[in-house]
A protein has these predicted regions:
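Conserved beta-alpha
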Residues: 2-209
Length: 209
């Protein structure tokens, strides 16, 4: 109904273009309605600088276990260590939210099962895994902005946890984007909204969904 009302012919989706376009949920929808669908992420995640890390006043070598939920925070952690000339001890343990994130550690360290644990991607699974290692001194690697649920829960459990921001979500380069070309822009997060409204005046924006 909304398509007929607005005479929609072109949509922008704020996501990376799927590797297999036919598997996109928009593919059949676009074909059935004779729509053009473009894909462009409006945000990106970048590691913090060494200066930003040091401002958080956390000593990596005072901790025994890293908690990771993304590849970007892993990259940032090891980049910070390299830049600060910190040698990560072989005794360091790692807890990851998924197996895919855990396997990414192989880029930097020898993968040993006794050192690396991973959850199934759910909050409760990750929490149980952390509690199982309750005597460790943790660094919780975060991407800003982040949901406070996990750091607050770990604090209530009185675990030795240092929440540290290793990455930030920032606006992508939108200089080549003309939002007036589109009838609808599909956004997926508050960060998408922020990036779009900071880059363009509201009167230049089409319908946002």
């Amino acid at each position: 109904y909304i398509l007929k009302t607005l005479k929609v012919s072109k949509i922008l989706v704020s996501q990376p273009r799927p590797a297999v376009i036919e598997k996109s949920p928009f593919y059949e929808f676009a074909a059935n309605n004779e729509l053009v669908v473009d894909y462009k992420p409006l945000i990106r995640v970048v590691g913090v600088s060494l200066k930003e890390f040091r401002a958080q006043r956390t000593e990596i070598l005072d901790h025994t276990t890293m908690i990771f939920s993304s590849r970007t925070t892993i990259d940032s952690f090891f980049h910070i260590c390299e830049e600060a000339r910190i040698t990560v001890p072989e005794t360091m343990k790692y807890i990851c939210n998924t197996e895919a994130v855990a396997l990414y550690l192989q880029k930097y360290i020898v993968y040993r099962k006794r050192k690396i644990s991973f959850a199934d991607g759910t909050f409760n699974s990750l929490l149980e895994l952390i509690v199982k290692h309750k005597d460790e001194k943790f660094i919780l690697a975060l991407t800003e902005p982040f949901k406070p649920e996990l750091p607050e829960t770990l604090s209530k459990l009185k675990l030795k946890v240092s929440p540290v921001v290793f990455a930030r979500t920032v606006a992508a380069d939108l200089s080549g984007l003309n939002p007036e070309e589109y009838d609808i822009i599909a956004l997926y997060s508050p960060n998408d909204v922020k990036a779009l409204t900071e880059a363009f005046p509201l009167e230049k924006l089409p319908v946002v969904a």
